[in-house]
Amino acid sequence: MKALHFGAGNIGRGFIGYILADNDVKVTFADVNEEIINALDKEHQYDVILADEAKTTTRVHNVDAINSGGPSESLKQAVLEADLITTAVGVNILPIIAKSFAPYLKEKETPVNIVACENAIMATNTLKDAILDITGPLGDHIHFANSAVDRIVPLQTNDNLLDVIVEPFYEWVIEKDAWFGPELDHIKYVDNLTPYIERKLLTVNTGHAYLAYAGRFYGQPTILDAVNDDNIRHGLENVLKETSQYITTQFNFTESEQAQYVDKIIGRFKNPNLSDEVTRVGRGTMRKIGPQDRIIKPLSYLYQNNLKHDALIKTAALLLKYDDTNDQETVEKNEYIDKHGVEGFLKSFAKTDDQLTSEIVKEYNVL
């Protein structure tokens, strides 16, 4: 089996490539980072190191890489030969990579599964729409399967450029009905993906976002520092109580199941062998304040149903306070707020109504 994976960064190598290689899949990475592409093409292997006490190490073999910066014969050949095409590039980049390989799908005669592995709800649909905008209708042998992915891969610098440190925990869930062919090991195939996507997004990503924005506000430089701050950790617990109410109300997870899941997630945040800078986790504020994203989506539901939502109000306010001159979205956010005010920003980007906007603005003003 052959896979073409777009995104040769830490998540691509340390999570998606790692799982595929463990299934004896021949992985070709596609990226625009020439340094990484050249290294992969030279070494054809790298180490994945678990952030546990033993630093358990697995060597990933039999990989190669190609540049995906534009049309090329090597990229075309990789698409035509692939049984699986995956991505880990960021949901905003999906339309860009679609341009690089979509035309080749018109020439493809063999079945392929296409799976976007992004921190976003139904990201494969986003990729599919971008592809079909370019190609028009494709044959029934092109299969698009949505997925939910979860593995913390921190910002890192290693002696070997290709080696990557990851947390021991991972979860990769794929739509069963949309998948073609034999199922792969270490991947969960489910009939209804939405509960898993939303549980992960509104527990892991919402919790991570709160720790990043609260950590930045209260002077804690890393996620580990933030979660070990009693005040911030108490706030995190309150945030996840609120998102848990949304999750158990909307989906078929019991309160006990969700409480156990929350405990597991907080334990992951506390892993002393795995820390991350709050500035890396906090970046992308314009996207993260969106109405269907990790903060406003559960907040709006709880607000509309007269359920407790104070902690999520504070999370939204902390995001608005967040400042990082190295993150372009945050720079744009702050420039917009300076010009149009917090209320104008929320109405334009969070799409909150007058009352909910007022609650967030009030919290913002007292921080």
UniProtKB/Swiss-Prot annotation:
It catalyses: D-mannitol 1-phosphate + NAD(+) = beta-D-fructose 6-phosphate + NADH + H(+). NAD(+) binds at residues 3-14. One of its GO terms (cellular component) is cytosol. Pfam families: Mannitol_dh, Mannitol_dh_C. GO terms for biological process: mannitol catabolic process. Its EC number is 1.1.1.17. GO terms for molecular function: mannitol-1-phosphate 5-dehydrogenase activity. Keywords: NAD, Oxidoreductase. The keyword Oxidoreductase applies. Belongs to the mannitol dehydrogenase family. HAMAP family: Mannitol_dehydrog (MF_00196). NCBIfam families: PRK02318.1-1 (NF002645), PRK02318.2-5 (NF002652). This is Mannitol-1-phosphate 5-dehydrogenase. It comes from Staphylococcus saprophyticus subsp. saprophyticus (strain ATCC 15305 / DSM 20229 / NCIMB 8711 / NCTC 7292 / S-41).
